[in-house]
Amino acid sequence: MNLKSPLFLRLSDRLDVYIRLMRADKPIGTLLLLWPTYWALWLASDGIPDLAVLAAFTIGTFLMRSAGCVINDFADRDFDGAVERTKNRPFAQGRVKKKEALLLTAFLCLLAALCLIPLNHLTWLMSLPALFLALTYPFTKRFFPIPQFYLGFAFSFGIPMAFAAVGNSVPVEAWILFAANVLWTLAYDTVYAMADKEDDLKIGIKTSAVTFGRYDIAAVMLCHGGFTLLMAVLGAVIGAAWAYWTAIPIVLLLQYRQYAAIKSRVRQICFETFLANNRIGWVWFAAIFAHTFFAK
């Protein structure tokens, strides 16, 4: 193949654009979606998830996160150029057309729908509100003062879907975990929004960081505290093994470190603190994994 041919260069350019639109080169969003889904799968299956179900949720999560990123850039196409962190995205650089982005979103959603084939009908039904939340979230930044709260619901729907896929029902522990994850999402995405706060104020985008104003850090820590409290409630409801409870002091320490970091409100530090939430995700997964092992 001639690597300098017009066709190859065109395909290479489109591939680069699509990867950047999908954030395939930035896996943190997929990880933050996967952790709560894995928590739910391991709890619902007593630590032995069916491999087909596990694969369906893993691939489906990646595809829907990618679709969400594409539609987010479509929704923010008139604003990203004015924000320091997003000024180099494909839409801001004029490298992608609106129709192209919408077709890519539809294609990714179609692929994600194929992941539902091995799952039961209840999971199929629950995928409909999940799809609606994922595709409408970016537009809430125009009118809803705390769009990160809405995002929390979108990012948490994998939890009841996982319980539905495993047991064909959604028990109370699924909804406790759902509520906990909404608060966790609100916490870490508010930190994410703090990195763009100055730019968002200038262009009129609504975010939780803007709405909370000077109380943004207090709101973040309140959400973190509520998240940890609900995880403790979940532990009590499921009669968690001792290993589950070891996560709480570790997570509290990680949350305190986040508090110490974001007090500066420095853009880069806020972004790095957002990324650090991946640690909280895997700590809780390790605790749930250990619980299912020792509870047998």
Curated annotation (Swiss-Prot):
Protein's membrane topology: Multi-pass membrane protein
Source taxon at top rank: Bacteria
Catalytic activity: all-trans-octaprenyl diphosphate + 4-hydroxybenzoate = 4-hydroxy-3-(all-trans-octaprenyl)benzoate + diphosphate
CC cofactor: Mg(2+)
Sequence intervals crossing the membrane: 28-48, 51-71, 102-122, 143-163, 174-194, 212-232, 233-253, 274-294
Cross-referenced Pfam families: UbiA
GO cellular component, one term: plasma membrane
Any one Gene Ontology BP term: ubiquinone biosynthetic process
Keywords: Cell inner membrane, Cell membrane, Magnesium, Membrane, Transferase, Transmembrane, Transmembrane helix, Ubiquinone biosynthesis
Function: Catalyzes the prenylation of para-hydroxybenzoate (PHB) with an all-trans polyprenyl group. Mediates the second step in the final reaction sequence of ubiquinone-8 (UQ-8) biosynthesis, which is the condensation of the polyisoprenoid side chain with PHB, generating the first membrane-bound Q intermediate 3-octaprenyl-4-hydroxybenzoate.
Entry's family note: Belongs to the UbiA prenyltransferase family.
HAMAP family: UbiA
NCBIfam families: ubiA_proteo (TIGR01474)
PANTHER family: 4-HYDROXYBENZOATE POLYPRENYLTRANSFERASE, MITOCHONDRIAL (PTHR11048:SF28), PRENYLTRANSFERASES (PTHR11048)
Protein name: 4-hydroxybenzoate octaprenyltransferase
